[in-house]
Amino acid sequence: MDRDEKKVTTVDLIRHGEPVGGRKYRGQIDDPLSEKGWAQMRDAVGDFRPWEAVVSSTLLRCAAFAQELAQRHAVPLTLDQRLKEIGFGAWEGRTAEELELEHPGILAHFFDDPIAYCPAGAEALAEF
């Protein structure tokens, strides 16, 4: 490689589509993609083909589409536990509405300072 040449690595981050069960704090609950979620993922990538590899969380809502994408483009797939969603502890499986009814203002506190207002039993944001 010439001194003036620089090798560039581009990383595309794609968030999963809608999981089965609607909007809720899912964290590490392993819900698969809904039909709408599959359509969202396919629409997001279209016929884009520059990837040399696909790396994904092990959670179904990510891994199933990653497997499809890697097979479609004949590139290697790596599933990596470290890419799993942050654990939301006591909030897992709950909707924002449920949390606000039980603890008014709790989400505003969390969004203002997620380190100080971490859900009970949740993975600390600083460790995530």
Regions found by a protein language model. Give the residues of each.
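Short, mixed-charge, low-aromatic patches
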Residues: 1-2, 20-25, 56-58, 83-94
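Acidic, low-complexity terminal tails and accessory targeting/binding regions
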Residues: 1-10, 44-47, 86-98
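Low-complexity, compositionally biased segments
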Residues: 5-7, 33-34, 106, 116
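Active-site-proximal alpha-helix that buttresses catalytic centers in soluble enzyme cores
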Residues: 9-75, 79, 102, 126
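Phosphate-handling substructures
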Residues: 73-127
